[in-house]
Amino acid sequence: MHQNEEKILAEFYGIISESKQHLFDTIAAERTKYLTVVLENIFQEHNASAVLRSCDCFGIQELNVIEKDNQYKVQRDIARGAGRWVDLYNFDKGQNPSLDCIQKLKEKGYKIVATTPHTNDVTINELDLSQPMALVFGTEGEGISQEIIAVADEFVKIPMYGFTESFNISVSVAITLNVLRNRLEESTINWKLSPEEQTALKIKWSKKILRAGNELEVAFRERLFQKD
């Protein structure tokens, strides 16, 4: 199966520039799903957009957005095109989108880490990285919902040394991802995407930069794998 996908990627690489090929290869090799970010009910567009950009910058491939009262919107000038490269999953259906999101992440094997002060919290430097984790961030005003706090596996905080009690959410995400990414880099944990995942991601990215990318993929598959 992977060989087939490699053939599809080779077809795309035959029509995109060598510089793009090199860029895709380099970035895909540093992408991760070991960490994923969850935004719950974020209402400020500039914060939501900045988080998307931070995910791309730190190699986080998946961003999960829970829309309860507020719709997730991206400001292009802030996101700087990050939405093309990061996989965005929206949870806005059903009676409780927050619990729907958490359940899906737990089914994928993620530990749920709530970024909120708690009697049992640890700092981002102390957080156990031995299991894939979903980092949940809430609004600056209300924070993370009680539904998520009740089912969270761990609680984490950023050390503070001033009078202000918290960072802006986009700053909190950037600091957290920076610290955890560096810790993963220094660890022996297998946190990178598998070769199969990297190939699939590079195919997806190739389609995004080409006009009629989806149609091209269909044509490649028909030509390469049609039955005799």
Specify the residue positions occupied by each region the protein language model found.
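N-terminal-biased segments
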Residues: 1-15
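RNA substrate-binding interface of SAM-dependent RNA methyltransferases
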Residues: 14-120, 179-185, 189-228
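Glycine- and other small-residue-rich loops at beta-strand/loop junctions that grip anionic moieties
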Residues: 40-41, 137, 161, 165
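Short amphipathic alpha-helical segments
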Residues: 50-51, 77, 125-126, 147-150, ...
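Short, hinge-like loop/turn segments at secondary-structure boundaries
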Residues: 79-84, 130-133, 175
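Active-site/ligand-binding-proximal alpha/beta "capping" segment
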Residues: 114-160
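Structured adenosyl-cofactor binding patch, chiefly the S-adenosyl-L-methionine
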Residues: 148-197
